[in-house]
Regions:
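Fe(II)/2-oxoglutarate oxygenase catalytic core
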Residues: 1-403, 409-449
């Protein structure tokens, strides 16, 4: 599913909405058959973790691309204040009030009031428009949205807004003693403290806050390279007999630092073969943390590793990489081919591909630190998905299907270089990735001593 909103809606419908329908009074006449059929499929349906992950993915897209929540609810991926959308799906998918409430509730449950306020505001607006009508699939109501939004504003320091929303709640449910008590407390606080309010809630600080702004700015304006007459396209053999009859198609993207894209590096059939081989083995990607490896919110993807013996297509791909780069990619000089799937809102925030600590698990391999990375796109995305080089201050957009090993000299990039030699002093710089849709890539890390 290319559209993240459609993916979220589908996961929510399968995980949450169906439960409400199957166990509703309207289904009582066919309860046994309906519930039996549902239970038979339940193990294959998305779980709560999937639904919450889809909601967090929408919030991640909201942040990285500065998207308007109101625009997202209308099915348009539009940066706040922009004149044109970043991405307009061929068939727009709108979000319901209940959808927006659920996204806001996921943020609310972890104390993230920056995101909960934006999504619950939209939920309240949409519930107000449809108040009085009832949708079988809705789990939430206007009262629920008002209640959660009021407390979000209170926790963010806006007591007067919390009071206003709580009073509105009581107009719909005047017998609710808890909310009535909240109103009394809010009124007392305003009497004691006055009407001075804190500013708007601040976005939660990430683990990579110092580079986050640069990363997101580059993702929002991908491929902004200044025209340079010296940049050109060429056919390259790199002195390899393997490339004599079918030279590599190289596009020089940047000279300082040097970055090139190789077009048509893999065929569609090869890409599908690699994805099919990796599919059954995909697991949540991990990052190095001291001597251990662990999951991290700044890397959201699934990955699998393929040996060159897995299929002739993998062996052929590695021979091609060796021919283009001039580097030995056989073990132990390179790791196995890593296939990565960036699903809904998948991304990898600023990071180094090489080890920065002597305790890294990489050193236990006794093959040296990483000196180069070849990255090949196996599929394309509808929008976004750029690779951003934050210290060099530029980004490279996804090349539609086929492949694009990247190359650059150090220390400005973490990707592979052609026709250059490296020593142990090599220090690749961080690279970042963010993808709003489903995207698969193959990566080959090369070691040096």
């Amino acid at each position: 599913v290319d559209n993240p909103l459609l993916a979220f809606g589908l996961i929510k419908r399968l995980r949450s909405d169906w439960l409400n329908v199957v166990y509703s009074e309207a289904a009582s006449e066919n309860t046994r058959e309906l519930q039996a059929g549902f239970e038979a499929l339940r193990q294959e349906l998305p779980g709560l973790e999937d639904l919450e992950g889809a909601a967090r993915a929408l919030m991640r897209l909201q942040d990285v691309y500065a998207l308007s929540v109101k625009g997202l609810a209308k099915g348009v991926f539009e940066p706040a204040g922009a004149r044109s959308p970043l991405y307009r799906p061929g068939q727009p998918v709108t979000l319901s009030a209940d959808d927006c409430f659920h996204v806001g509730k996921v943020a609310y449950d972890v104390g993230d009031y920056y995101h909960s306020i934006a999504w619950l505001e939209e939920a309240v607006d949409l519930f107000r428009l449809s108040y009085g009508s009832w949708n079988t699939e809705d789990l939430a109501s206007l009262e629920d949205a008002l209640d959660h939004l009021a407390f979000s504003y209170f926790m963010a320091g806006n007591v007067s807004h919390a009071l206003s929303l709580s009073r509105e709640f009581l107009r719909y449910d005047p017998s609710n003693l808890r909310v009535a008590k909240n109103v009394a407390q809010y009124e007392k606080l305003l009497e004691e403290q006055g009407t001075a309010e804190l500013g708007p809630p601040r976005r939660p600080d990430g683990t990579r806050l110092q580079t986050r702004d640069a990363y997101e700015e580059l993702c929002q304006r991908p491929g902004t390279q200044h025209p340079t007459p010296s940049l050109r396209c060429s056919y390259e053999t790199n002195g390899s007999p393997y490339l004599l009859l079918q030279p590599a198609k190289r596009e020089t993207v940047r000279l300082r630092p040097y970055v090139a894209l190789y077009h048509d590096f893999v065929s569609d059939a090869e890409a599908e073969t690699v994805k099919a081989l990796a599919g059954p083995w995909l697991q949540r990607s991990v990052v190095a943390s001291g001597e251990k490896q662990q999951k991290a919110e700044y890397r959201i993807s699934k990955s699998a590793w393929l040996k060159d013996t897995a299929d002739p297509a993998v062996a052929a791909l590695e021979r091609r990489i060796a021919a283009v780069t001039g580097l030995d990619v056989r073990a132990p000089y390179a790791e196995y081919l890593q296939v990565v799937n960036y699903g809904l809102g998948g991304h990898y925030e600023p990071h180094f591909d090489h080890a920065t600590s002597g305790k890294s698990p990489l050193y236990r391999m006794k093959s040296g630190n990483r000196i180069a990375t070849v990255m090949i796109y196996l599929s394309s995305v509808e929008a976004g998905g750029s690779t951003a080089f934050i210290y060099a201050n530029f980004s490279v957009p996804v090349v539609k299907v086929r492949g694009d090993p990247r190359q650059a000299p150090w220390p400005t990039s973490g990707s592979t270089s052609t026709g250059r030699s490296f020593g142990s002093h090599v220090a690749p710089g961080p690279r970042t990735e963010a993808a709003p849709g489903s995207n698969s890539a193959a990566r080959l890390q090369i070691q040096g001593k």
